[in-house]
Regions:
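N-terminal glycine-rich phosphate/pyrophosphate-binding loop and immediately adjacent elements
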Residues: 1-133
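A conserved FAD-binding loop/helix module that cradles the flavin
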Residues: 53, 478-501
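Active-site/ligand-binding neighborhood in enzyme catalytic cores
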Residues: 129-250, 448-456
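A glycine-rich dinucleotide-binding beta-alpha-beta segment and adjacent secondary-structure elements
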Residues: 182-197, 366-372, 425-482
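Mid-domain catalytic core of redox enzymes
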Residues: 231-232, 259-382
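A conserved beta-strand/loop element that lines the FAD pocket in flavoprotein oxidoreductases
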Residues: 247-260
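Active-site-proximal substrate-binding core of FAD-dependent oxidoreductases
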Residues: 265, 438, 501-506
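FAD-dependent oxidoreductase catalytic-site/capping-region signature
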Residues: 367-453
């Protein structure tokens, strides 16, 4: 079967490689002159940066992403190292202790900070263990077996009363202190999702304890295994390089600087794609990644889609963007930056800050920012004795009363002002600097709206299914039903590719 894969982000690369390994005839079309999209990162003056804090979740040997990379023969070619995050709030810090404190260290530490919440923290922990067991059994259930299914549904019972709760409701069940609640939902700012609109049980997923302590074992309790957070030595560009070598060896044909302008459909069946020069590429199947609205409204004749499907695509909730300051520095601030990713929060009002960003109002760093220091694990990403550093904030994709291109220098200066409160004298240590705005990211991704992590994970929101109403057209990536994040798109794209290849046996 002749298959065209549109886009070479991790979703497209995974699908293309999987299909080629299954003996399909694959053509990969990439709009840029390089593979990987934003995952590829960039270089300047001997420094190399990723576009933000790109850690791989679930990339361990027996974890979902790790298993896919293993099946594709890629994992053994990568140096994947355990990672963790540190969190700095206005009144306290949550940092991995120098001496290992066990799987429950963070909960015990929070009891010291919030003694009145000790009973609620114990109840939270009991449900965290239950949720971890539920997710472990869900992964096992995918492999089949009545025993796994029975164990899964038995484990679901203690949590079923909370299945329709929001994160706001879930945390109110355990805690009264607003600062403590913020600890458990602060990462939702990155998702542009208010706690009042996020799945309650999802709080346990975004608080995987191994993300706070890389020495922690996977085994939490019987039938309860935690997923880990990892970094790829050399940065994400190394992962893309390994993929590039693999797809070439597998026989994938790749065309760079090729933008698809139309997907051809005849009698509700895909028959080819057309590029910016009007060249037709006949095919039996198209696997599209990237923007949902761009794919379904710009590349297809509106008449081929059911009206209700188009209406739903139009209303999918997307995240907004990020403002990034990439620095080459000669000081790593080891007393402050002890992990590759350190979150600095200026506010406990996660709900209010997300809603403000959704209204087009940029906090300029006042509400918080992230410092990513990949050189801590990957010294080769900077010249000897120097360090690659990225400071970034979430931000509106479009500003309400300003312009990204016109005011980017002003915003960069303001962000440095906030960063220097924690990293004194940072400006004196900057050797090179690159500002990246939502406009830059929009150009790289070929999107009309740059969504940092794809679709926003709002409670009960509809997602674009991988298998579309058009025969032979599949949709993958961060704006598809898989949701965003490499831990989501890599396994999902692998499964979609396997499903397409399996369909040829019938």
């Amino acid at each position: 079967m002749k298959i065209v894969v549109i886009g070479s982000g991790l979703a497209g690369l995974t699908a293309a490689l999987t299909l080629a390994r299954r003996k399909q005839d694959v053509l990969l079309l990439e709009q840029n002159e390089f593979l990987g999209g934003v995952t590829s990162g960039f270089e300047k003056d001997g420094f190399r940066w990723d576009y933000g804090q790109l850690n791989l979740e679930a990339a361990g040997e027996d974890e979902p992403v790790g298993q896919v990379l293993e099946l594709l023969g890629l994992r053994k070619l990568l140096q994947i190292v355990p990672e963790q995050r540190d969190y700095i709030f206005p009144d306290f810090e949550i940092r991995t202790p120098a001496e290992y404190g066990g799987v429950k260290w963070r909960i015990e530490y929070l009891k010291q900070l919030f003694p009145a919440e000790a009973e609620g923290l114990e109840r939270y922990w009991a449900d965290y263990v239950r949720f971890t067991r539920l997710m472990t059994l869900a992964r096992r259930m995918e492999k089949g077996g009545l025993g796994a299914k029975a164990a899964f549904y038995t484990s679901l019972l203690p949590l079923i009363s909370k299945k329709d709760w929001t994160a706001e409701q879930l945390l109110a069940h355990y805690f009264t202190d607003e600062k403590l609640k913020a600890v458990f939902v602060s990462i939702l700012a990155d998702f542009f999702t208010p706690p009042s609109q996020f799945q309650g049980l999802g709080v346990f997923a975004i608080n995987a304890e191994r993300a706070y302590e890389r020495r922690m074992p996977a085994q939490l309790a019987r039938n309860a295994e935690m997923l880990g957070l990892y970094a790829v030595a050399g940065g994400m560009k190394e992962l893309i390089r390994i993929y590039e070598v693999a797809i070439k060896a597998a026989g994938v044909s790749t065309r760079y600087n090729t933008t698809v302008t139309r997907i051809v459909v005849e009698h509700n069946q895909v028959s080819g794609v057309v590029d910016q020069d009007g060249k037709l590429y006949p095919c039996d199947c198209v696997v599209a990644s990237g923007g949902a609205k761009e794919t379904f409204f710009n590349l297809l004749d509106p008449a081929v889609l059911p009206e209700d499907f188009s209406a739903r695509v139009k209303d999918i909730p997307l995240m907004d963007s990020v403002f990034m300051l990439h620095l080459g520095v000669d000081e790593a601030y080891p007393e402050v930056l002890r992990s590759t990713s350190t979150y600095f929060y200026g506010s406990y009002d996660i709900e209010g800050q997300v809603k403000q960003a959704q209204e087009g109002i940029y906090h300029e760093g006042k509400a918080g920012f992230v410092v990513h220091l990949p050189s801590l694990r990957s010294p080769a990403m900077a010249p000897k004795g120097k360090y690659a550093m990225t400071i970034y904030t979430i931000c509106p994709e479009k500003l309400k009363s300003s312009n990204w291109e016109k005011d980017k220098e002003k915003y960069a200066a303001k962000l440095l002002d906030y960063a220097e409160k924690y990293l004194p004298g940072l400006r004196k240590h900057i050797l090179t600097q690159v500002i990246v705005t939502p406009l830059d990211l929009r150009r790289i991704t070929h999107l009309q709206h740059h969504a940092f992590g794809g679709i926003a994970p709002l409670l009960n929101s509809w997602r674009v299914p991988h298998q579309t109403p058009v025969q032979g057209l599949w949709f993958i990536g961060a704006q598809s039903e898989s949701g965003g994040g490499m831990n989501a798109v890599i396994p999902a794209s692998f499964k979609v590719a396997q499903k397409i290849a399996d369909s040829q046996r019938r």
